[in-house]
């Protein structure tokens, strides 16, 4: 064991004795290490870095394009919303106009129906009045005939004589009815 410790101690002492440092390798190591490093650096610089830049540029363009498309879509949506709101306002205005026209038309129809009803009512009243006057005239004429006949019958009964002369009879009846009309003016 002592021998192995001695060997380790000698190994540590060897690099220091030869003048080589652990921190500073020999020049040939540095040159041979720089050559693969430079080759890798050139390959990286010529092949990997341009592809990486291309991917980054493409991604940046895609992001910018996406933002522009999103802004365009947002502007289009905003324009569509404004158009929709304008159409909605126009539809509401049109609906209000239609309601107002319907109200006015309803009032016109109501007025027309009232006028027609009044005309029909007046026509019915006038027709009823004409019928009533005609019936009244008919009743008055019937009553005159009946009264004439009753007065002749009464006169015959009172006189005890039969009044056979039509001319006398009609003259007597006409005088009686004329007297009756003067007593009750307008046939009332």
From Swiss-Prot:
Its main location: membrane. The chain crosses the membrane at residues 30-50. F-type ATPases have 2 components, F(1) - the catalytic core - and F(0) - the membrane proton channel. F(1) has five subunits: alpha(3), beta(3), gamma(1), delta(1), epsilon(1). F(0) has three main subunits: a(1), b(2) and c(10-14). The alpha and beta chains form an alternating ring which encloses part of the gamma chain. F(1) is attached to F(0) by a central stalk formed by the gamma and epsilon chains, while a peripheral stalk is formed by the delta and b chains. F(1)F(0) ATP synthase produces ATP from ADP in the presence of a proton or sodium gradient. F-type ATPases consist of two structural domains, F(1) containing the extramembraneous catalytic core and F(0) containing the membrane proton channel, linked together by a central stalk and a peripheral stalk. During catalysis, ATP synthesis in the catalytic domain of F(1) is coupled via a rotary mechanism of the central stalk subunits to proton translocation. Component of the F(0) channel, it forms part of the peripheral stalk, linking F(1) to F(0). One of its GO terms (molecular function) is proton-transporting ATPase activity, rotational mechanism. The keyword Iron-sulfur does not apply. Keywords: ATP synthesis, Cell membrane, CF(0), Hydrogen ion transport, Ion transport, Membrane, Transmembrane, Transmembrane helix, Transport. This is ATP synthase subunit b. It comes from Corynebacterium glutamicum (strain ATCC 13032 / DSM 20300 / JCM 1318 / BCRC 11384 / CCUG 27702 / LMG 3730 / NBRC 12168 / NCIMB 10025 / NRRL B-2784 / 534). The keyword Membrane applies.
